A protein has these predicted regions:
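Positively charged n-region of N-terminal signal peptides that target proteins for export
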Residues: 1-4
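Bacterial N-terminal signal peptides
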Residues: 9-17
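N-terminal leader/targeting segments and the immediate start of mature chains
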Residues: 20-97, 133, 138-141, 218-224
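Short, exposed beta-strand/loop patches in secreted or surface proteins that constitute
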Residues: 64-68, 87-93, 117-119, 163-171, ...
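Short, hydrophobic/aromatic-rich segments at coil-to-beta transitions
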Residues: 68-77, 93-105, 172-181, 192-198
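Acidic, serine/threonine-rich low-complexity disordered tracts
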Residues: 81-85, 172-178, 193-224
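An acidic-aromatic
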Residues: 85-150, 193-210
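Extended beta-strand-rich segments in extracellular/periplasmic secretory proteins, especially
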Residues: 137-140, 148-201
Length: 224
């Protein structure tokens, strides 16, 4: 009987000890680290410069090339948007240009009166002069803005074209010309010298008359 009572107390003691023992806490674990997204690297590709496609027929190019071998200098009368209803006299040799604007007032008796514009394409300079015998005050008058004073020449019209094709033939000023559709407009190009006698572009007309080839001297285009 005593053994049974002792065993009972032993069992009760074990139950009490178990009930009073602190519950085992789970071990904390480190939070799971999410992978850091790397910023996307943008590779900038170099931009290729697209050159305009040149479409100039072989026969027209051969016509334009005549101006390089047959025209060393030239003088002509020009009428265009810059001149109104009047003609300007042009003299061209190499990179030197002189043109004489139309003078509504023929007297050149003022200090700032001028009758000629001289242009140097290489130096990009322009200046006004009074050279006529009846100039009261001869010599240089003032420097001018190059872009303001410059008027495209017969050579400029056939330079830097990206398109040119023959569309016909006509006679202008008793000279045979090719009618050529170009990226700058319609040109009537002298069949022998390869330079335009007429041009039409954006509804405007340009005329080059009384051409004289290879007669211009340095003294005509360089102020003295």
């Amino acid at each position: 009987m005593k053994k049974q009572i002792l065993f009972l107390f032993l069992v009760l003691g074990l139950i009490y000890i178990t009930a009073c023992a602190p519950a085992q806490q789970p071990q904390p674990t480190a939070p799971k680290q999410e992978p850091v997204a790397q910023p996307k690297q943008t590779v900038t590709q170099p931009t290729a410069t697209i050159q305009p496609k040149t479409e100039i027929s072989a026969e027209v190019q051969e016509l334009f090339d005549k101006s390089k071998t047959r025209v060393k200098s030239i003088k002509y009368k020009y009428k265009g948007p810059e001149t109104g209803d009047q003609f300007y006299d042009f003299f061209i040799k190499d990179t030197k240009i002189r043109y004489n604007p139309y003078l509504a007032i023929k007297t050149l008796d003022k200090q700032d009166s001028y009758d000629s514009i001289f242009i140097d394409k290489t130096a990009k300079t322009a200046a006004s002069y009074c050279l006529a015998a009846y100039c009261a005050y001869k010599g240089k008058k003032q420097d001018l803005g190059y872009s303001d004073a410059y008027i495209p020449t017969v050579f400029d019209w056939i330079t830097g074209l990206t398109k040119a094709a023959k569309i016909g033939e006509e006679v202008i000023d008793s000279r045979s010309t090719w009618k050529v559709d170009t990226s700058k407009g319609i040109l009537w190009v002298d069949a022998f010298y390869g330079i335009p006698l007429k041009g039409e572009s954006s509804g405007k007309s340009y005329r080059f008359q009384q051409l004289s080839v290879n007669v211009v001297q340095d003294s005509d285009v360089v102020p003295s």
